């Protein structure tokens, strides 16, 4: 059961949380180096 339920839970985590972390880290990188 867990093997069937895990991908349906793992895909949204990677699809939503990873881009959010990437955007946040990019934002902090820009703020830190003042590229704007």
Swiss-Prot record:
Membrane topology: Single-pass membrane protein
Disulfide bond among keywords: no
Entries under Pfam families matching the protein: PSI_8
The keyword Phosphoprotein is annotated on this UniProt entry: no
Membrane-spanning parts: 10-30
Entry's Gene Ontology cellular component terms: chloroplast thylakoid membrane; photosystem I
Keyword line: Chloroplast, Membrane, Photosynthesis, Photosystem I, Plastid, Thylakoid, Transmembrane, Transmembrane helix
GO biological process: photosynthesis
Main localization of the protein described in the UniProt heading: plastid
InterPro entries in alphabetical order: PSI_PsaI (IPR001302), PSI_PsaI_sf (IPR036357)
Domain of life assignment: Eukaryota
Cellular localisation: Plastid, Chloroplast thylakoid membrane
UniProt family annotation: Belongs to the PsaI family.
NCBIfam families associated with the record: PS_I_psaI
Job of this protein: May help in the organization of the PsaL subunit.
Name of the protein: Photosystem I reaction center subunit VIII
The organism of origin for this protein: Carpobrotus chilensis
Gene: psaI
């Amino acid at each position: 059961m867990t093997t069937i339920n895990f991908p349906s839970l793992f895909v949204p985590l990677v699809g939503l949380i990873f881009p959010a972390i990437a955007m946040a880290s990019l934002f902090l990188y820009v703020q830190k180096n003042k590229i704007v």
